[in-house]
Each structure stands twice: as C-alpha cells, then as structure tokens.
Amino acid sequence: MFILNNRKWRKLKRDPSAFFRDSKFNFLRYFSAKKFAKNFKNSSHIHKTNISKAQSNISSTLKQNRKQDMLIPINFFNFEYIVKKLNNQNAIGVYILPSNLTLKPALCILESHKEDFLNKFLLTISSENLKLQYKFNGQIKNPKSVNEIWTDLFSIAHVDMKLSTDRTLSSSISQFWFRLEFCKEDKDFILFPTANRYSRKLWKHSIKNNQLFKEGIRNYSEISSLPYEEDHNFDIDLVFTWVNSEDKNWQELYKKYKPDFNSDATSTSRFLSRDELKFALRSWEMNGSFIRKIFIVSNCAPPAWLDLNNPKIQWVYHEEIMPQSALPTFSSHAIETSLHHIPGISNYFIYSNDDFLLTKPLNKDNFFYSNGIAKLRLEAWGNVNGECTEGEPDYLNGARNANTLLEKEFKKFTTKLHTHSPQSMRTDILFEMEKKYPEEFNRTLHNKFRSLDDIAVTGYLYHHYALLSGRALQSSDKTELVQQNHDFKKKLNNVVTLTKERNFDKLPLSVCINDGADSHLNEEWNVQVIKFLETLFPLPSSFEK
C-alpha cells in the first residue's frame, strides 16, 4: 500500500509519468525481495529464481531510480545507519565497534540466523537504494544480482563489505566499510570466525543480557552489565574561543585599546571570521558526536546562524570567566588562563580553535585514555629555547616563559610545541597550575594583547606540566597545518581527495586553516579556503537555525 504524502502529491502533479514509473518500480522491487525470500529453500542450496533484469541488477536499480524522486536524503550515512535500518527489519545479531573508529566495525550473525538475516539485509539495501561491494577471493566484487550475493555469502564465514549511496546532500558518494561475520553456535558457547576486542569464544553462561543474539542487532559489549575497561566513564566537553572582527562593539573596543605599533598580535587577520565556526561545528557533529556540551567563549554577539536553543550549545561571554579588571581583552593568551572557570564544564574537555576541523570519525579514545590520562599531539621537532626576545613570535615567547617555570619545577628542559590541533585538557590540572603560578597567570590575564611577558597556558605550559607529572602521554596521531605561505592549494586538495576515498589511514586527525600575517588580503588563499570548507562540510549541522 502506498501513502501519498505531500512530496508524492507534488511529484504526481509535476510529472505523472515519473510518479507512476517510480512507484511501480518501488512496489515491484519490494515484492521481488519478499518473493525471493519466500522461495528460498534452505541455506545449503541456492534456489535459482527467475528475476527480471531490472529487479535483479543492483547497478541498474541505482541508475534507473533517482534519489530525489524516491527517497529522502540521508544526513549521516555510516555503520550506525545500517544497524538502525536492520533493527527496523527485526534482524538478529550483534555489532562490535572498534576502539579506533577508523578501523572497520563488525556485524556478527549466528549461522542459524543466516538465511533470515540475508533476506532482511538485501531488502534493506534495496529499499534504501544502496550500492553493495565486498571482498571476495582477494578482489573487490560488484555483485550484479541477488542470486550472486546469496551464492557468495553462503560460501564464506566472514567478508569485508562496503555500502555506498548518492542520497546524501554531499557532492560525492558517501560510503563505509564493515565486516560481516557468521558465528558458529555450540550448546555451551558461540564462536566468532575472527578475533575481536571482547572475546572470540563467548561462553553462554557469561552473557548477562538474555536478549543478546535473540532480539535485535545489539552491542556485543552487552555481554556484561559493567562497562568495558577500555570504555570511558566520564563526559568530555568541547570549548571554542571565537571572535568576529565585523562585530560593531568589538570594533569600537579594538580601536580604543589597540596599541600604536603593529604586530602579528594586532593584525586584523587574527580576528577575521569567514564562518569557520560553522564549519568546525559541522565537522564535530559529523566526526565527534561523543561530545557532551559545546562551550563557545567570546566577547562578540553570537553569529546569526547559530541556534542557541540547541541544548548542546552554551555561549560564554568573557565576563563570565574573567574578572572585570582584565576586560576587554584581545589576547588569546589571556583568555586561555581562564577556560577552567567556565561554569558547568566537565573535568575533561577538548580545547579547539574555530579553524581546527576534524577530518575523520573520532571517539573519546582519540583524546583521553579510559583512565583519564590525556593524549597530546606534540610536534615532532623542538622549537622552544632561549630567552624572550622582542620581535619574536608571541606564541614562542609565551612558550619560553612557560618553559622557565617547567625547568624550575621538574628539573627538565622541554622544546616541543603542541600541533595546531584540538587539545586534550583537564580542569583539575589547570586549577593546580593557577594555584602554583598565581603571579604568572594574573599577569597574562591582564594583558590586553599578546605580550612579551605572557605565559602560553594552553599552548605550552599545560601539556608539558601534565606530561611531566604523569597525567598525559604523547599520541602519534597526524595533524595538518595549512598556512598561506605553504603550498596550500595542494594541501587542501589532498585532504579533500583522501576524504572522498575514506582513506582514514592517511587522513590527518584534523586540519588547521591558519590565518595570520594579513592572510585576509590574499585573494587566492581566501578562495581556496572557502572552497575547501564548503566541499568538505556542505551539510548544515543541528547547531544551525
């Protein structure tokens, strides 16, 4: 039975022939899948059913039926999407999410449920207009018919699969890989065909959830009522600092307090906004959905597009975390002395600039170990040594001042800056440092612009203090910094290419589009940056009105 919703009525009026053609095809396709399932005799013998060319050829299905005429677009196409669809079909099995989301998740089905699962799986990918590929006999295979899929999948115990769709609003095909496994069942245990993070051999008496392998597609971790040792039992928040140089009130204050001399600390390119925050939020919703709350620290009005009614978003003005004596401020060093004073912030948080963008799926484990130890992404080379020098970069002088404190405290010298990427931070450590170095914190807090006597709290001091006190470890995650004095077009295009290929091994954890040195005057830079942002993150997030 077909229900004519508003979209279908509009299509019927606009193009009657297309309406009846596609509606008929939808019905035939659904009927064909049901008929095929009914005619299937047993798992040891593939019944050869005569299926029309249009119905049996998966590639033809995708080509002949346009997504905009038949199905609503998919906002987020990933492994969770297909699990949800299979649960809607009442399929039975378990799924395993890897600790590293750039690895393949697994979908595990009992051999005794194989026939029923494949019926529902094929019906799902057909009704959702998805393209299926899988690795078979060492090669990636594009199956041409339902019979071919049945024959292949009944001959193996596990297979790597790729599902893709052009139904997203992105300019490219969306796709993901997962592992499909068929488990053998004994009266006492279930045996998985490959090793996994929990257990390959599952003793039935150890299963705490009696619905496992009996109802729905459930998380394999439900074998216990306790959290797994690698799971994080704490919330993680996200903090942005943000400024808009076009804000009228900000301009008046900047004009009033700007010193007579010019430096990179006072360059307007440092405060330029090309809506990077919008794209940064899109990247986090797409690739970092584990975040509990997002705090945006600013002395400007919120951008018009931001939905402050979203319960995940909290706008924080400088006066909420900084004393009146320090305001107004135009120094990121000053603001960063006070992030741990944000009301309601979790002890564990990630500090990010609005020009840091996530490029691939991440989870809590990319930023913290499950025991709370922070993961740092320090640069591979050292830069910090010597005394503060007038005319040297402000970030470097701030790191030098921090280095002096670290040498006195730990009797070790440090040289490595943190990469331009999201930073894993803990408020308890920041409070501890503020108490230990009150004079240095207070002096930096009251500098209107970056100054020679600043300490770089989040840029240097925190990371090495946490590392040397045993509360942080270095991570090997790759990150990418793009500046106007780089071959920026090549760098940006490379990230786009790797993203389209879903090449997570080569993709950096994040990319930083770093303005500065009057980069806003470089027209080619501006064009390429905007093109990059709109290509990588074209879909609005739930944080937008």
Swiss-Prot record:
UniProt keyword Transferase present: yes
InterPro entries: Stealth (IPR047141), Stealth_CR1 (IPR031358), Stealth_CR2 (IPR021520), Stealth_CR3 (IPR031357), Stealth_CR4 (IPR031356)
UniProtKB keywords: Exopolysaccharide synthesis, Transferase
GO molecular function: transferase activity, transferring phosphorus-containing groups
Domain of life of the native organism: Bacteria
Enzyme class: transferase
A Pfam family this chain is assigned to: Stealth_CR2
Enzyme Commission no: 2.7.-.-
Entry keyword annotation includes Transferase: yes
GO BP terms: polysaccharide biosynthetic process
Role: May be the polymerase that links individual UDP-N-acetyl-D-mannosamine monomers. In serotype A the capsule is composed of repeated units of (alpha 1-6)-linked N-acetyl-D-mannosamine-1-phosphate.
Similarity comment text for this entry: Belongs to the stealth family.
Misc. remarks from the entry: Stealth proteins are part of a protein family that is conserved from bacteria to higher eukaryotes. Family members were first identified in microbes as proteins that help pathogens to elude the host innate immune system. Microbial stealth proteins are involved in the biosynthesis of exopolysaccharides. Stealth proteins are predicted to function as hexose-1-phosphoryltransferases.
Protein name: Capsular polysaccharide phosphotransferase SacB
Source lineage: Bacteria, Pseudomonadati, Pseudomonadota, Betaproteobacteria, Neisseriales
